[in-house]
Amino acid sequence: MSKSDQEHTTTEPTIVAEEELRIPELLPLLPIRDVVVYPFMIIPLFVGREMSIKAVDQALAGDRMIMLATQHDIGDEDPTPDKIYNVGTVAMIMRMLKLPDGRVKILVQGLVKARIAEFVEFKPFHTVRIERLVEPVAVDNLETEALMRTVREQLAKIAELGKQISPEVMVILENITDPGSMADLIASNLGLKLSEAQMLLEIEDPVRRLTKVNDLLAREHEMLSVQAQIQNAAREEMGKNQKEYYLREQMKAIQQELGDHDGKEELEELRKAIETARMPENVEKEALKQLGRLERMHGDSGEAGVIRTYLDWLIEIPWSKTTRDSLDIIRAKKILDEDHSYLDKVKERILEFLAVRKLNKQMKGPILCFVGPPGVGKTSLGKSIARALNRKFVRISLGGVRDEAEIRGHRRTYLGALPGRIIQGMKQAGTRNPVFMLDELDKLGYDYKGDPSAALLEVLDPQQNNAFSDHYVNLPYDLSNVLFVATANHSDPIPSALFDRMEVINIPGYTEEEKLEIAIRYLVPRQMKDNGLKAKHIVFEEEALKEIIAKYTREAGLRNLEREIGNVCRKVARKIAEGHKRQIRVTPAAVATFLGAAKFLRDDEMDKNEVGVVNGLAWTSVGGEVLHIEATTMAGKGGMALTGQLGDVMKESVQAALAYIRSHGSEFHINPDWFQENEIHVHVPAGAVPKDGPSAGCAMATALISVLTKVPVKKDVAMTGEISLRGKVLPIGGLKEKILAAVRAGMKMVIIPEQNRKDLEDIPKAMQKKVKIVPVKEIDEVLKLALEKFPIPAPKGKAKPATPKVVVRPSKEISA
């Protein structure tokens, strides 16, 4: 290490400019523990290690320059080179003071950054060869200026939040124009972690270093903001608690002076409420036991609040209060007819219940389940039943319920526990014999918390529900006098054990005539009232309502019909509000003006008799539909293609129909070798709509026989029925909806299975007069009615297979 020519006699040398500094290549190294020194930073250091003191002495004996580098571990007394950061700062020792305990205090000023290239000597102190780090000159542009201004603002904000920043530093920052110097000054005054401070020291680009400082300032600002919020909240809470404690103590003192014991009065009120609640003996015994526990507790304890809530529930649950049933059958029938047209099966069942109840007062309530499509009146029917019986009505929706505790409640050990939906509904009703509706029963779910449908088994079992146990109440409750009414759109999702406990009443969709009558009697008056209209403002023609039903709604229920009627009423209300004086008459021609273009067009009827095209009947979630089942043949190597998104059951129906045809090929004059040389393609239009079900078997067989024998099928004949390998026609479901679809499509004849003859009782006589319904037992009877010629004549020549007509069907899920 070179020595200065001039001997230093003062401890505070004159600092020269950075460009005038001559930094020696070899310098003594002073490892520092818990601080990072930046250029131009002035800081006092306490030196206690013998090796470090010798390094300071060596620097003072020369040009006072020393290399400062931070060691990784502050507790390491003798750090090896690999435990010292290789980037540090060359500093000038400005002052030195020897302390009585042998340590040395020095005041140093950082000069320039440098990197340790190698360790030259290790004894008696570390001597290192350094490489000076020259920073690139920052470009003076708007982005740099904006960054520096942002940093100043960030620093001012954290100073306002309580960060100790020297006022002198704030003044210096206002005059600094170099981003690197600004970054170093802030970093040295921010109190950063050792790793963060070292990381900033090692960044050579001044703009990038200042950007990192800005990020650290933003983090510090956010941390100080959160800290201030926590301190304010704690201060407020402490003040609030102290105030409450002071007021509570004052209140206790005042109550003692007045002889007022509010807690005892509350307990006495609870005791009286328990005695007047007419609880069963075992329930009253448990309530008094819990009241005794409450009396022995401090009023402010958490357990006391739990017991008090539990006692409130026991008092409010109706243990013995009932409403007196209205057993007037004539009155009940009148109420049911007022609220709902048709639905005769449901009304008949309720009147039967009233009749039996009149003869046997101890009869338990039935458990009914209404199954039908949306909008047919299942939920509103429950309200009518309650009104007819003079009972309270309570409804809970089970759609989306996935937790058993929703039905049975939570045990009282859980924080915020409450009874389940059943007990809550009974409390809401206020009597022990309400009409209790379990809506959307088929929408129940289940997960790892349990299966709520299993919890309903006890509720809906007349043999068990006289002692229903809720987890929260934990006492038997009698539900046997409750008239449970469940509703569902489909019966398939309901578990069989639960389904078996209920009396299922199917509510099919309405015919167009029924919808028309309901619209005239109920929907139009209700929508006129809801929209503030009177008879002098609007009148609906019957043909206009038919137009709305036929072309603007396609559903089994009435919701869309009421919605469209309401849409017309709103438009009329607007015209009246705008000053229209005359009565507005809604005619069929005016419907399109109010509602726009028709939403549903009739495309079910074919133009002529065609080969290989049959009118099948299907049931959908919105009622019945006519399906045009098409078949064609082509040259090939045998085989059959099925298209139209057919389900497995429908595909098997086609296979069964083809097997029957091949086994009876001679009757239809079909050469057995034909199936080896040709291919068959069966298609059901509306290919985007999934279709499944066995009831298209007859239609499939008829289409195949027609295309194989080239005998056309009558265009005005529709059919439904499953086919067996022996040619038997088997029964199907949804007959009313399917016949309604046939009538709507203009069919003149509907072929149904003989075993469905009993279901004709449910079909209105008016509908049966519009179409000829023919029950059949075998496929030969179907062919005789559906084909133009039967028996099949022998072919005279080879004919080209007929090209089926493609018909576009509405997009909805279809079950044949």
UniProtKB/Swiss-Prot annotation:
Matching CDD domains: RecA-like_Lon
GO biological process: one example: protein quality control for misfolded or incompletely synthesized proteins
InterPro entries in alphabetical order: AAA+_ATPase, ATPase_AAA_core, Lon_bac, Lon_bac/euk-typ, Lon_lid, Lon_proteolytic, Lon_Prtase, Lon_prtase_N
Conditions for induction: By heat shock.
Gene Ontology cellular component terms for the protein in this record: cytoplasm
Lon proteolytic domain span: 608-789
Active-site residues from the entry: 695, 738
Main location: cytoplasm
Enzyme Commission number(s): 3.4.21.53
SMART domains: AAA (SM00382), LON (SM00464)
Ranges for region Disordered: 795-816
The protein's enzyme class: hydrolase
Localization per Swiss-Prot or TrEMBL: Cytoplasm
Entry keywords, A to Z: ATP-binding, Cytoplasm, Hydrolase, Nucleotide-binding, Protease, Serine protease, Stress response
Biased composition (Low complexity): 800-809
Molecular function per GO: ATP binding; ATP hydrolysis activity; ATP-dependent peptidase activity; sequence-specific DNA binding; serine-type endopeptidase activity
Recorded catalytic activity of this chain's protein: Hydrolysis of proteins in presence of ATP
Domain Lon N-terminal stretches: 27-221
Superkingdom of this protein's organism: Bacteria
Protein family: Belongs to the peptidase S16 family.
Subunit structure and binding partners: Homohexamer. Organized in a ring with a central cavity.
Role: ATP-dependent serine protease that mediates the selective degradation of mutant and abnormal proteins as well as certain short-lived regulatory proteins. Required for cellular homeostasis and for survival from DNA damage and developmental changes induced by stress. Degrades polypeptides processively to yield small peptide fragments that are 5 to 10 amino acids long. Binds to DNA in a double-stranded, site-specific manner.
Name this protein carries in UniProt: Lon protease
